[in-house]
């Protein structure tokens, strides 16, 4: 596979963080290594098999990093300022949405400036995806930090197939109604063609919210939007890479070790 970053790709993952961490050796040489964590563990085998591009923040504020190729796919870092990290990520994503979605003992905090930063950053991620996607490409948006990206991306590139997956719980309407910007977030997710959740209960909670939107009908895992699109709402519990583990377990090396 080519080591050159492609102009356009047919498959993109859009996530808050990139799947790599930067390493600098004693001589100052920079390399990128796969990050630990559930999201990378779940998606990296897909990226290695399909190729394409991963769009996300590289972890350091106030810095622009050029795109590069890594382990069979392209990496497109999205720059964030220190203030955006504080307001969009540490603020709205992790101090507003995270405790609300998990129904934590810690109360969610609501600040207008956090919400403004969340919108601004989500639009930047959507713009990057719109720029890198080929005609009719599939874009897979990940998790609660990027709830608005599907709608923004739909407005920019209606030709794309857009999926969204939430890796954390989705609360019932009684909890979600506490959020001042709940309508905007639901509309953001309805920009996708498919909205996926970890559990049937989370999918049912979102469907119930969706059908309260003006002009939206929702039932039996489908939502019909005012512009005539059908959005699939379903649960897709993430599993391990069973095929990869089977191949490893049946490899000659492992079988030889097991026979000792």
Predicted feature locations:
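Catalytic cores of carbohydrate-active enzymes across secretory and cytosolic contexts
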Residues: 1-260
